[in-house]
């Protein structure tokens, strides 16, 4: 259960983040007519939110545990989705993309750091290989499909689609936690 929890958190966090981030410039600039400089600024803030928390995420995982940081990542992603359901303007895109970056950081780092605790020494190359193949294949599919989904649906619908992946992440984490503590 822990290996699956780590894999699901990492893969779907990357998929959700890539799916929405890739569609953002198209939605902001081409569809909503927000300036290219503001669109670029939102992406810059998003990237900062993806990586700056890494300075403390490891310590948060040590203090609170992998699962709690994963739940926090899901909640941060939920803020992204909720914000995206309101008016599509510069401020809402900015808030949504900052929380998208923060959620990705918590989920991806907690997932990848949990992964190394889920296998024996002789399994490490195979386990890491499977993980990377699945994570980056799903991420590539999300990137390639973002423009298609945006053209066929809407920014709001794309965000709602991401709820499915958040539910899967939460359920895999709950399952792993219950297996760890069967008395719950």
PLM feature segments, named:
Residues 106-119:
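Intracellular juxtamembrane helix-capping segments at the cytosolic ends
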Residues 148-166:
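A membrane-interface helix-boundary motif in multi-pass transporters
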Residues 2-17, 98:
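Pair of pore-lining "gating" transmembrane helices in MFS-fold secondary transporters
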Residues 123-152:
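A late C-terminal transmembrane helix in Major Facilitator Superfamily
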Residues 22-42:
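Short amphipathic helix-loop junctions that connect adjacent transmembrane helices
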Residues 52-66, 150:
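Helix-to-loop junctions at the C-terminal end of transmembrane segments
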Residues 68-82, 163:
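Structural signature of the two symmetry-related core transmembrane helices
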Residues 80, 91-99:
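Paired small-residue
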């Amino acid at each position: 259960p822990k290996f699956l929890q780590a894999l699901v958190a990492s893969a779907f966090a990357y998929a959700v983040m890539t799916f929405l981030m890739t569609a953002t410039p198209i939605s902001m600039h081409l569809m909503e007519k927000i300036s290219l400089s503001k669109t670029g600024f939102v992406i810059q803030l998003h990237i900062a939110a993806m990586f700056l928390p890494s300075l403390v995420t490891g310590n948060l995982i040590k203090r609170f545990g992998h699962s709690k940081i994963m739940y926090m990542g899901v909640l941060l992603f939920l803020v992204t989705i909720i914000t995206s359901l309101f008016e599509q303007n510069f401020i809402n895109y900015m808030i949504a993309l900052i929380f998208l970056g923060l959620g990705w950081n918590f989920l991806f780092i907690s997932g990848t750091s949990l992964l190394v605790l889920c296998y024996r020494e002789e399994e490490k190359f195979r386990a890491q290989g499977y993980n990377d193949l699945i994570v980056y294949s799903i991420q590539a599919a999300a990137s390639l499909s973002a423009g298609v989904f945006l053209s066929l649906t809407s920014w709001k619908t794309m965000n709602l689609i991401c709820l499915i992946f958040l539910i899967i992440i939460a359920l895999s984490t709950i399952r792993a936690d219950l297996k760890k503590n069967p008395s719950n």
